[in-house]
Amino acid sequence: MQWDTQVTLDGCEHLVTQAYCSALPVNYSLPLQLWERFARLILEAAYEATLAAAVLNASKSGNKSVYLTLLGGGAFCNDQVWILDAIRRATKLYAGFDLVVKIVSFDHSKPAIRKLCEEI
């Protein structure tokens, strides 16, 4: 976690809190299905920890916004279903904290991501 750090864009003076997370790289060896349970566990832990930090940040700053990316969906080849399931699980765990969860996706929003946003 990087708490209360500056944004590195010209003219931005607000502070943000960043969670540095990663997913398991499942594309380098063994069949993908052998990695699934472990990869899902890593994704669940990353999103749960991020939302836990968002709750702490909201209690300190009053800002309830949290922006999530799709961890491991690129070069690491984590299945989109695993990623979305992990986000869904974490948002259910923290549903009582009124966080404003936003999904940031590369290029354009996919139908599955739009559907998830409607659910959460």
Where are the language model's segments positioned?
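Macrodomain-like recognition of ADP-ribose-binding/processing modules
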Residues: 1-66, 71-120
